[in-house]
């Protein structure tokens, strides 16, 4: 028929599933509206899907128009479901408008728009219209008129562009970035509806409508709606319009409520007029779809005059012209222009609904022809009314002599108001009032009229109250139902619509029906069937709604994650791939063994499909039928109920006519219904009590009645009825399941009753009865049945096992293996699983062959620990191996394992899959190759439990843990001891001789009692407290355990033979890599010796307290800080050593030394976090020395051991980072890091990123600054502290985020003033020392501090030669007693100190100060001096770190604020605690990292036992390098920990071992471009100095002396950014040992830092050195070939080693931050970052490195700098830098303000950092490269200091970029990227202005100075 309307729905699927319900509802509402308007037969529709983002979609199945009907709608829904799935696809190049236009064109051309109907067009339609028949033509005309000519329509269901920006993107797509101007309407029209499309639409009478499906949240957040109105305007030209989606679903008010409920924060809460919800949806659609003149004629507009109140002093009354449009067709129209007089305002007015008071409503608007000013005023009035929720009271003069009418004006929208005119039916009322008013004098008219208004309003309220009270009472159930829905409005029918088809009757309503039926007293006569039907319906609806919500929730969660995140799965995510494969294979094998039939029940799929608490519909229907015999009755009193129940009970028992379970169910439900009808609170509890008191009998009471009952059948029947009653109780009162005790009692009682049945009858009868119970209740209460079977001791039947929740068996793992006493019963025996007695190896072999042969019919069975989310108790299963077998097979326990060659571990990992099955089959000789610990498995208790009770009895007493240390379960995961024991006790039987079940959290005391060195004790302690279940990846834990046990066994030997481990340069440099034992031994020995002297008391304090403090700090970033701390320490040591041996060292050595110094600073700088933390650590330790001293005398000692200056530098920041709590330095940094993270992820990120960078920067700057300060002291000492403070102040704001970076240079106080300053302010340094700064504070402080520290580290080396020489002298001279050292330190640092004093904050934290005032070199230097002093104490500090760190660390944050005095205090404290060391360290730090190192070395040499010696050891002792190497794997943290532990030993060792064997390492550039390490034996005396230096370098820089190791670390970090995060130590290792460890890094990055970072890192630091921190080091060494591979590319990829770390950090910073959250991770990142630059330097080699470094200074902070690095061949570094920069920027974006501070810091720090890094990266790296064979160093022979200086200062380094210009450029770059970031903070601007100079000066001058010093 010609009059048939064709409707096309064109749906955009780009929005995804989020819009599914919105689109569905809009389509359904639209079709319903059209079918109501034209008739079902007159509307034919089709639908088409397209993707406006360009994703390809399959063609729609429906190819032509169809009639409206359920079938076509079902097709639509099906297609919609399939299309609107969440799928990831990137937007294509073409804009959305193009795709939309293409889809529209296809729609117009592909469909038959004008095809006539099949029925004859001439046949008239018999439709009565009045009294005539309509022919086709007249019908068509009428139809056209009906909807304003609407014949055919296309409805586009897609999000409509709202803002101008969205419109631009819609039209231009990817080009929107380049195009700045908004598109003109013409452009939009040409893109969307070009002329050809419009012509086709006109020809086919098609109107185009756009149904906007934009999400609410986006709608409210849109800045403007210009795009929306532009589209509206365009569509109006063709007769169409935009239809808001709320027209089809909810009103605005509801939408607003939904938004608020969903937690979406709107910038401003939307003010929605109640009128919007009053208007029916059909009215809205009519208005939108009708454009015909006829429609508008139904609502004629008229003009009116709005008279505003007369203002005082004005005689003329202002008037506005308005238009009035009736809202309804039936209301009376005014006859002439209406006059409206405003009288006042009223609040809380609602539309009256009184029957006596009628209302007419008119829409008031401002006419288009009125002046713009008036329109604006009108809109302001409307918005004011809306905002204040006011209404205006007005008099309306209708004219024609009629009296004025009272009206109320309410806001409707932004430009319209509603005038509601009250018209009463009694006209007399108004007449009377008016007559009275006329009678009165004119003066009284106003007041009288106000009285009239009041009286009218009062009457309105009275009438409302009357109608409310008079209204017939609404039934309670109806009110309840209405209460569950939103308030019903006049559009109630419209509102019901969206719910009726989707939800049906609500569960609340059905529950009310049940109540109605149960509560009505006069329904006795109602049929039994009807009552049962209502009851069953109610139950069905309620259960169905529950099931739907459950399934929907499960589907949602399924969509969110593909696989369940079980604890085991999460744990395995941290493992290396081979281990992961091994564990999955092992667990799945066990699952296969448990379910050989391949039933996938174990996978937990059935748990999802079954609703634990609900019966299926079929079962309900069955029950409904059975119930009809017992009618639920209505009882008035409880007595009636009880008598009925007892009568029923006795009748059932006596006659047996009624089915027992039906009777039981009926009785329980009757009681429940009765209590419900009484409105009982706690219904289920009361119901249970009622049933227990009146119905339940115990088996004891039944037995006592046995004598009375002669009838055995009655007795059995009663027992069965009691069983059913209890089961029904569990079913109908689910609350009983929540109480374990109640459930146990019920199960116990049922068990007793069943046993009575079995005794009375026989087991076969019982089996039959159990089958019946199973059939009835398996779907509803499977867990109860499972418990029942367990209680009876029966094997759980297969069908029940399949239904049980997946976590059922992990609670009682023995259920399926239990021997059943009733195995003779057929149904039981058939279901029982056979228990295989064959050894596990046979089973594995059998499984292996079977799985290979078997076809894949069934889905892979996954082990519960992998497949199930709910896992109650995890255990460690340790296979019990007899001692004999162990001996035979050479499977030695952990203690001996360290002696194994590293290759063993490699082989084990490599052959992991094969060994899984072959382990038992290997010959003893082969097995000896992998005599690692028997792998401990964390599995569900279900696995591999066999009944070998005989053997167990023999072996039970002999079970011995093969693992000496088991990581402590994190507090938040710990199960109460009582519950744990109860669970284990509740297991049906002992696991058996094979399996030892170890509780997850063994007593801590056991660990302590183990005989081991203090350092190891700390390590194990921290390990015990580590947050990870497996300290790291399993491989690592094995190696660590091996080392650990080995160390335990050999701890004494180690003490005696520290040197013995250093046999050759190779072992020295790569010992940790090649031999787990020797490095660890070395470290252990060194550590032990030192720890005995200094660390013995300190280490325990630091590391023992760490348990708690570590945990606390770790809670933030425990691991990272520690690592960072250690790393800083190592660097500090290195500097000392370097300083000490610079003079003695050859240029190469010096370079190496420098590098190592750099490295030490670079660690902080390389890995921003590291540097941040390290500096902090140093500061903290120094500063902490004081605070710690106050806090823990022991710790202070340690701190003393560690350079106070260093401590302040590192420690303070560290403190800030970690928390005063963390005992170990590393921990504190972590804390601070964690704290910032806590403070705000973004800020943390910024701090972490920027801070890492900033830290790095700052660290560098600080180090540099220290150096600079030395240099500057001479050159710029004059620069007042105030100046520095100013600088600091400028930077501070930025420091807020990365306070460390820029702010640190600034005066700490000022910093505190700034965001960082604020933090600092919160806890002044002094205060900080005592109190831990707030997390934020710590964070900010940390950044500041660490930069200082880093700077001091770096700076010291470059520091003025005099200082260097001074330090050297100090180094050379045996360290004076602590007091002397302190004095010396003070002397050395006096200028700095004075500076520090001038800048209390800066001086307070030498490191911090430096960081604070990188710009103020003098201050920095002073700080650095302090730091230098501190460096010597680093070893001590290490020991001290834990406790001291905590205080210091916090203090360090305060330190920034603290005055010089504090610094002095720290120094003095350091002195007290090994001031000699501290002093030397501090001095070395002050003069330069080299000096510091030298000092430390000297100390170590002079006083092997003195803390100073530890510092020296750390930096310079050969042992230390070994350990460093060892640490490398772990990362700087390990290194630091090693140093801390080894410092005394190391120093001592360096003294001892240095003389016996000293090696000179030179980096040589080969033609291939790879660096070559040349190791020469050196004169023992010089060697002593040089070696300690190199060692310190290697340990400190891990790049200088152990360049190879250091590099590999870097490379590792590079190769595995994740590892970097995972285990900062690893990254560091990677960086340090790219050559050898590099490959490992990739493989082993599984340092398991994931855990390590959070909790392991601290252990790493602590035990990282002695233990093999990561599997990397421990067992798997990369083949030499791989190690020797050029790493340039990889480094670049990874972010250029340290760069990589940085890059990784930067690129992954967001993620990295989260990773960094774990202390270790943060540290790792920083380390990795620091290391990475070194790697790149390796690659740069030679001169290239220097230039590279130089630019990197800026480059690190800036992309430009990065690019300059790239120019030098540091492309990788550049990438890293860029990545990091990007990450930083991302962080900045996240937190602009913070970022700004951070950026400024980062930038300022960056320059200084880069300068610092430069020395560290450029010089140090060059040296490191030289030192490290793997790195490719361009320097063939050692560069002379002068040559290096020349290179450094060469313009080539800056290639057209002055350092200042470079820094500017980078800054500019930054600004471009984040203009707001840069410009937001004046500080950052100021800093940027200054920074270039300081940076330039720092970089060039510092480098020159540094070189000269060297």
From Swiss-Prot:
Pfam families: Treslin_M, Treslin_N, Treslin_STD
GO molecular function: chromatin binding
Highest taxon listed in the record's lineage: Eukaryota
InterPro entries, alphabetized: Treslin, Treslin_M, Treslin_N, Treslin_STD
Basic residues composition-biased segments: 850-859
Chain intervals with Basic and acidic residues compositional bias: 545-558, 595-608, 616-632, 1001-1010, 1275-1289, 1489-1500
A single GO cellular-component term on record: cytosol
Ranges of biased composition (kind: Polar residues): 893-902, 1027-1046, 1805-1816, 1850-1863
Coiled-coil annotated spans: none
GO biological process: DNA repair; DNA replication; mitotic DNA replication checkpoint signaling; mitotic G2 DNA damage checkpoint signaling; regulation of DNA-templated DNA replication initiation; response to ionizing radiation
Subcellular localization(s) per the UniProt record: Nucleus
Keyword terms, alphabetized: Cell cycle, DNA damage, DNA repair, Nucleus, Phosphoprotein
Region Disordered: start-end pairs: 545-568, 595-632, 833-859, 877-905, 981-1012, 1027-1453, 1488-1523, 1580-1637, 1687-1709, 1746-1766, 1796-1830, 1850-1877
Composition bias type Gly residues, residue spans: 1694-1704
Main location: nucleus
Protein's UniProt keywords contain Phosphoprotein: yes
Modification sites for Phosphoserine: 292, 441, 599, 820, 838, 865, 923, 938, 1001, 1026, 1057, 1078, 1125, 1141, 1413, 1484
Positions of modified residues (Phosphothreonine): 1134, 1307
Role: Regulator of DNA replication and S/M and G2/M checkpoints. Regulates the triggering of DNA replication initiation via its interaction with TOPBP1 by participating in CDK2-mediated loading of CDC45L onto replication origins. Required for the transition from pre-replication complex (pre-RC) to pre-initiation complex (pre-IC). Required to prevent mitotic entry after treatment with ionizing radiation.
PANTHER family per record: TRESLIN (PTHR21556:SF2)
Subunit structure: Interacts with TOPBP1 (via BRCT domains); interaction takes place in a CDK2-dependent manner. Component of the replisome complex composed of at least DONSON, MCM2, MCM7, PCNA and TICRR.
Assigned protein family: Belongs to the treslin family.
Protein name: Treslin
Species: Homo sapiens
């Amino acid at each position: 028929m010609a009059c048939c309307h064709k409707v096309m729905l064109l749906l955009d699927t780009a929005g995804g599933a989020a819009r599914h319900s919105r689109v569905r509802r809009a389509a359904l509402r639209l079709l319903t509206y059209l079918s109501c308007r034209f008739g079902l037969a007159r509307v034919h529709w089709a639908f088409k899907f397209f993707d406006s983002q360009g994703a390809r979609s399959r063609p729609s199945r429906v190819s032509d128009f169809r009639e409206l009907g359920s079938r076509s709608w079902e097709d639509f829904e099906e297609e919609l479901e399939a299309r609107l799935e969440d799928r990831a696809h990137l937007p294509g190049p073409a804009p959305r408008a193009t795709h939309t236009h293409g889809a529209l064109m296809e729609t117009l051309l592909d469909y038959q728009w004008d095809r006539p109907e099949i029925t004859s067009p001439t046949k008239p339609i018999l439709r009565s219209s009045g009294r005539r028949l309509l022919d086709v033509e007249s019908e068509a005309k009428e139809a056209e008129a009906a909807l304003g000519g609407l014949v055919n329509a296309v409805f586009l269901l897609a999000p409509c562009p709202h803002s101008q920006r969205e419109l631009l993107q819609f039209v231009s797509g990817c080009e929107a970035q380049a195009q700045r101007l908004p598109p003109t309407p013409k452009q939009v029209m040409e893109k969307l509806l070009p002329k050809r499309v419009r012509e086709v639409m006109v020809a086919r009478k098609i109107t185009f409508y756009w149904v906007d499906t934009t999400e609410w949240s986006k709608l409210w957040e849109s800045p403007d709606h210009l795009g929306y109105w532009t589209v509206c305007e365009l569509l109006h030209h063709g007769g169409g319009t935009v239809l808001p989606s709320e027209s089809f679903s909810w009103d605005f008010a509801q939408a607003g409520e939904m938004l608020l409920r969903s937690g979406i924060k709107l910038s401003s809460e939307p003010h929605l007029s109640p009128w919007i919800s009053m208007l029916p949806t059909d009215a809205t659609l009519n208005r939108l779809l009708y454009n015909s003149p006829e429609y508008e004629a139904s609502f004629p507009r008229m003009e009116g005059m709005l008279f505003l109140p007369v203002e005082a002093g004005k005689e003329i009354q202002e008037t506005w012209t308005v238009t009035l449009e009736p809202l309804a067709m039936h209301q009376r129209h005014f006859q002439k222009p209406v006059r409206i007089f405003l009288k006042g305002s009223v609040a809380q007015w609602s539309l009256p609904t009184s029957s006596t008071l009628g209302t007419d409503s008119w829409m008031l608007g401002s006419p288009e022809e009125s002046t713009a000013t008036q329109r604006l005023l009108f809109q302001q009035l409307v918005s004011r009314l809306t905002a204040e929720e006011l209404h205006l009271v007005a008099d309306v003069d209708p004219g024609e002599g009629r009296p004025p009418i009272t009206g109320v004006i309410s806001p409707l929208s932004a430009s319209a108001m509603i005038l509601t005119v009250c018209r009463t039916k009694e006209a007399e009322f108004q007449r009377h009032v008016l007559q009275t008013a006329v009678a009165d004098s004119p003066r009284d008219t106003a007041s009288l009229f106000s009285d009239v208004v009041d009286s009218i309003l009062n009457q309105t309220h009275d009438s409302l109250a009357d109608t409310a009270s008079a209204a017939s009472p609404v039934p309670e159930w109806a009110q309840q139902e209405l209460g569950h829905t939103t308030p019903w409005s006049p559009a109630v029918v419209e509102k019901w619509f969206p719910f009726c088809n989707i939800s049906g009757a609500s569960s609340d309503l059905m529950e009310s029906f049940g109540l109605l039926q149960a509560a009505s007293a006069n329904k006795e006569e109602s049929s039994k069937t009807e009552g049962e039907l209502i009851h069953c319906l109610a139950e069905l609806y309620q259960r169905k709604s529950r099931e739907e919500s459950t399934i929907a929730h499960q589907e949602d969660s399924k969509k969110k994650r593909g696989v369940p995140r079980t604890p085991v799965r999460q744990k395995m995510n941290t493992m290396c791939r081979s281990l992961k494969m091994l564990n999955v294979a092992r667990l799945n094998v066990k699952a296969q063994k448990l379910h050989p039939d391949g039933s996938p029940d174990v996978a937990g799929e059935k748990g999802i499909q079954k609703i634990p608490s609900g019966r299926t519909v079929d079962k309900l229907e069955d029950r409904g039928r059975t119930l009809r015999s017992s009618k639920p009755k209505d009882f008035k009193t409880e007595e009636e109920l009880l008598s009925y129940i007892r009568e029923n009970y006795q009748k059932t028992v006596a006659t047996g006519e009624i089915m027992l379970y039906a009777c039981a169910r009926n009785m329980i439900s009757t009681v429940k219904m009765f209590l419900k009808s009484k409105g009982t609170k706690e219904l289920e509890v009361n119901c249970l009590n009622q049933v227990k008191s009146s119905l339940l009998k115990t088996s004891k009471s039944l037995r006592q009645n046995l004598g009375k009952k002669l009838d055995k059948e009655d007795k059995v029947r009663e027992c069965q009825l009691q069983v059913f009653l209890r089961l029904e109780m569990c079913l109908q009162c689910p609350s009983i399941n929540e109480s374990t005790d109640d459930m146990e009692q019920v199960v116990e009682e049922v068990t007793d009753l069943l046993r009575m049945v079995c005794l009375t009858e026989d087991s076969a009868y019982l089996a039959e009865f159990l089958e019946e119970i199973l059939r009835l209740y398996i779907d509803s209460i499977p867990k109860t049945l499972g418990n029942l079977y367990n209680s009876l001791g029966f094997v759980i039947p297969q069908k029940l096992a399949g239904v049980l929740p997946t976590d059922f068996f992990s609670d009682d793992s023995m259920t399926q293996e239990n021997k059943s006493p009733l195995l003779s019963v057929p149904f039981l025996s058939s279901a029982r699983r056979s228990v295989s007695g064959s050894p596990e190896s046979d089973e594995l072999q059998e499984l292996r062959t079977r799985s290979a042969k078997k076809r894949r019919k069934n889905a892979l069975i996954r082990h519960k620990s992998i497949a199930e989310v709910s896992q109650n108790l995890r255990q460690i299963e340790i296979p019990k191996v007899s001692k004999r077998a162990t001996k035979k097979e050479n499977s030695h326990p952990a203690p001996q394992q360290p002696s194994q060659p590293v290759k063993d571990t490699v082989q084990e990992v490599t052959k992991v899959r094969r060994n899984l099955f072959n382990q038992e089959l290997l010959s003893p000789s082969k097995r000896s190759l992998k005599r690692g610990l028997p792998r401990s498995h964390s599995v569900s208790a279900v696995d591999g439990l066999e009944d070998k009770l005989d053997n167990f009895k023999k072996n039970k007493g002999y079970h011995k843990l093969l693992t000496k240390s088991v990581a402590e379960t994190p507090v938040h995961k710990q199960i109460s001891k009582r519950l744990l024991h109860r669970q284990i006790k509740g297991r049906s039987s002992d696991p058996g001789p094979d399996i030892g079940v170890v509780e997850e959290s063994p007593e801590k005391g056991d660990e302590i009692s183990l005989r081991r060195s203090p350092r190891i004790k700390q390590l194990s302690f921290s390990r015990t407290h580590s947050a990870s279940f497996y300290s790291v990846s399993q491989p690592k834990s094995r190696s660590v355990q091996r080392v650990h046990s080995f160390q335990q066994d050999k701890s004494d030997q180690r003490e005696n033979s520290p040197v013995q481990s250093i046999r050759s340069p190779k072992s020295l440099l790569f010992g940790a890599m090649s031999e787990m034992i020797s490095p660890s031994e070395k470290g252990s020995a060194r550590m032990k010796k030192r720890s005995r002297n200094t660390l013995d008391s300190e280490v325990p304090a630091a590391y023992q307290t760490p348990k708690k403090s570590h945990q606390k700090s770790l809670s933030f970033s425990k691991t990272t800080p520690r690592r960072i701390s250690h790393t800083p320490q190592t660097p500090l040591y290195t500097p000392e050593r370097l300083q000490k041996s610079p003079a003695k060292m050859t240029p190469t050595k010096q370079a190496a030394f420098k590098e190592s110094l750099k490295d030490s600073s670079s660690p902080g700088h390389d890995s921003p976090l590291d540097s941040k933390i390290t500096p902090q650590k140093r500061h903290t330790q120094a500063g902490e020395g004081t605070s710690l001293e106050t806090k823990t005398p022991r710790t202070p000692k340690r701190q003393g051991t560690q350079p106070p200056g260093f401590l302040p530098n590192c420690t303070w920041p560290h403190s800030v980072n970690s928390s005063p709590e963390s005992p170990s330095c590393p921990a504190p940094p972590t804390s601070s890091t964690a704290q910032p993270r806590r403070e705000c992820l973004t800020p943390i990120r910024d701090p972490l990123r920027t801070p890492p960078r900033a830290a790095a920067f700052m660290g560098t700057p600080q180090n540099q600054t220290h150096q600079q300060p030395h240099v500057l002291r001479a050159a710029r000492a004059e620069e007042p502290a105030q100046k520095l403070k100013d600088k600091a102040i400028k930077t501070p704001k930025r420091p807020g985020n990365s306070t460390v970076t820029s702010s640190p240079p600034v005066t700490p106080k000022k910093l505190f003033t700034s965001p960082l300053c604020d933090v600092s302010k919160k806890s002044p340094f002094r205060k900080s020392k005592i109190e831990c700064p707030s997390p934020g504070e710590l964070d900010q402080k940390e950044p500041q501090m660490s930069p200082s520290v880093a700077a001091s580290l770096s700076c010291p080396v470059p520091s003025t030669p005099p200082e260097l020489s001074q330090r050297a002298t100090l180094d050379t001279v045996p360290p004076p007693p602590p007091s002397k050292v302190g004095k010396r330190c003070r002397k050395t640092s006096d200028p700095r100190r004075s500076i520090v004093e001038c800048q209390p904050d800066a001086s307070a934290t030498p490191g911090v100060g430096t960081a604070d005032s990188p710009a103020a070199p003098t201050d920095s230097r002073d700080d650095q001096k302090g730091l230098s002093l501190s460096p010597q104490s680093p070893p001590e500090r290490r020991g001290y770190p834990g406790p001291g760190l905590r205080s210091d660390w916090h203090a360090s944050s305060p330190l920034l604020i603290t005055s010089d005095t504090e610094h002095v205090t720290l120094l003095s404290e350091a002195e007290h605690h090994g001031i000699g060391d501290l002093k030397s360290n501090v001095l070395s730090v002050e003069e330069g990292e080299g000096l510091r190192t030298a000092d430390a070395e000297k100390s170590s040499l002079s006083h092997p036992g003195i803390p100073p010696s530890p510092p020296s050891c750390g930096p310079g002792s050969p042992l230390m390098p070994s350990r460093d190497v060892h640490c490398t794997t772990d990362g700087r943290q390990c290194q630091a920990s090693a140093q801390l532990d080894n410092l005394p030993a190391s120093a001592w060792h360096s003294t001892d071992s240095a003389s016996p064997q000293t090696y000179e390492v030179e980096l040589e550039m080969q033609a291939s471009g790879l660096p070559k390490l040349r190791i020469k034996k050196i004169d023992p005396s010089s060697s002593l100095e040089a070696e300690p230096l190199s060692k310190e370098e290697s340990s400190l820089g891990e790049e200088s002396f152990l360049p190879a190791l250091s590099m590999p670390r870097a490379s590792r970090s590079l190769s595995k950014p994740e590892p970097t995060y995972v285990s900062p130590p690893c990254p560091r290792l990677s960086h340090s040992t790219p050559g050898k460890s590099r490959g490992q890094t990739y493989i082993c990055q599984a340092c398991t830092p994931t855990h390590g970072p959070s909790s392991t890192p601290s252990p790493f630091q602590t035990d990282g050195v002695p233990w093999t921190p990561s599997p990397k080091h421990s067992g798997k060494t990369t083949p030499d070939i791989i190690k020797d591979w050029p790493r340039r590319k990889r480094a670049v990829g990874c972010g250029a080693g340290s760069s990589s770390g940085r890059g990784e950090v930067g690129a992954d910073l967001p993620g990295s931050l989260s990773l960094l959250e774990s202390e270790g991770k943060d540290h790792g990142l920083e380390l990795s970052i620091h290391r990475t630059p070194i790697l790149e330097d390796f690659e740069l080699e030679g001169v290239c490195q220097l230039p590279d470094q130089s630019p990197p200074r800026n480059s690190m902070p800036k992309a430009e700098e990065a690019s300059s690095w790239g120019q030098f061949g540091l492309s990788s570094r550049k990438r890293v830098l860029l990545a990091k920069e990007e990450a930083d920027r991302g962080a900045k974006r996240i937190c602009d303000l913070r970022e700004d501070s951070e950026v400024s810091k980062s930038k300022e720090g960056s320059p200084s950092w880069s300068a610092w890094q430069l020395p560290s990266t450029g010089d140090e790296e060059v040296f490191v490269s030289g030192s490290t064979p793997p790195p490719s160093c361009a320097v063939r022979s050692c560069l002379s200091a002068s040559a290096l200086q020349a290179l450094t200062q060469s313009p080539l380094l800056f290639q057209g970029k002055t350092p200042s210009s470079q820094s500017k450029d980078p800054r500019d770059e930054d600004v471009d990227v984040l203009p707001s970031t840069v410009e937001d903070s004046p500080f950052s601007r100021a800093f940027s202005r200054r920074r270039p100079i300081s940076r330039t000066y720092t970089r060039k001058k510092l480098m020159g100075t540094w070189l000269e010093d060297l």
